[in-house]
Amino acid sequence: MIRERREAYRDARLIVIASEGKDTERIYFKALAKEYTNPRVHVHILERSEDERNNSSPEHVLKQLNNYKNQYELEADDELWLVVDKDRWTDAMLSRVATECTQEVSMHMALSNPCFELWLLLHIEDSALLTPEEQKQWMENRRKSKNADPYLKVRLRQKMGSYHESSYDALALIAHVEDAIERARALDKNPADRWPQTLGTRVY
């Protein structure tokens, strides 16, 4: 099959993002792309079909990116980004995904440990100011009860006043994106590792 070309923006570098979350990452990156427009860069966030919405494994997200790559004719400077969480996924699975990413020049993995909410929280809170016990709470990201939200979602709600993974004010966070980048870099003690082994996020 002849691959299609995305003619509408082929003069621009293309950045394609596929994420593990159903809504949280999509809301954030769409707002970010709208706020930081650049005629030489086009950001495309892949949507999931209804059949795919409950399949969030890193392997499935990688498959989604590969399907896109095989369907469209990409240029040498285009980038494909896999945005996933450490959460419950095994090191063996993440290693397989990371290995495949390193075999493709255009493919990159941005993993958050424990989850993407860490990246959001770094916009408005500096993890360097936390006590060791608080840092442990962030990393463990536990629920107080079976039906409660994980710790970082609760923390975001406390800091923002209102937060739900499918509806939140991403622009309020993006106003502090430079702070988030600086804080994420400070957390990344071993940037040569394929993903953060401790509290950290490579979304920066």
PLM regions and their residue ranges:
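C-terminal accessory helical subdomains adjacent to catalytic cores in phosphodiester-
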Residues: M1-A12, I27-D51, K69-W81, D85-Y204
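Conserved beta-strand elements of the Class I
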Residues: L14-A18
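Conserved residues at beta->alpha junctions
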Residues: S19-E20, V84
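Phosphate/oxyanion-binding active-site loops and adjacent basic polyanion-contact surfaces
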Residues: G21-E25, R53-L62, T198-R202
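Alpha-helical scaffolding within the catalytic cores
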Residues: K63-Y68
